[in-house]
Amino acid sequence: MGVEQPLGDNIVTASLDGLVNWARKSSIWPMTFGLACCAIEMMATGAAKHDLDRFGIIFRASPRQSDCIIIAGTVTKKMLPVIKTVYEQMPEPKWVIAMGACACSGGVFDTYSVVQGVDEALPVDVYIPGCPPRPEALLYGLMKLQDKIGKERNSFGSAIGLGDRLEPAA
């Protein structure tokens, strides 16, 4: 959140986009969707050694309380509808992280029953390669997602009654 203009000692102005993006990136609540070996590394990332809480990242078990889903492991064609349903239950804005070679590209499983990358069904924001990726890699991926969220451009016109107008009303 960049400071645009200091006013005196106690007042700081900033853009609404910057303020909202700062709040969103500082409180990511991912839902864990561990399907294979990568889930163990995801659990290790949530342990005390790496301390995700210091980044405002708290794992949630319900998609209705999450704004990010971490898909970790082999996604089969039978599991894909479940992942889509969980994704649709998440409120907007929502982000997707593909963790591990299997979630990113199908991994070593080049077969009819394995989805060759979860990006065939969901819009993936961050890819974390590895088999399985280390907890530090997941932490780095989450920090990259925070950077991406911080640079997003939002349109809050509809929230204050302006709709999608680009020009002021006459």
From Swiss-Prot:
EC number: 7.1.1.-
Cofactor remark: Binds 1 [4Fe-4S] cluster.
EC top class, as a word: translocase
Subcellular location: Cell inner membrane
Residues the record lists as binding [4Fe-4S] cluster: 37-38, 102, 131
GO CC annotations on file: plasma membrane; respiratory chain complex I
GO BP, sorted A to Z: aerobic respiration; electron transport coupled proton transport
UniProt keyword list: 4Fe-4S, Cell inner membrane, Cell membrane, Iron, Iron-sulfur, Membrane, Metal-binding, NAD, Quinone, Translocase, Transport, Ubiquinone
Listed cofactors: [4Fe-4S] cluster
Domain of life: Bacteria
One Pfam family hit: Oxidored_q6
Family: Belongs to the complex I 20 kDa subunit family.
Subunit structure: NDH-1 is composed of 14 different subunits. Subunits NuoB, C, D, E, F, and G constitute the peripheral sector of the complex.
Protein's UniProt name: NADH-quinone oxidoreductase subunit B
Gene that encodes the chain: nuoB
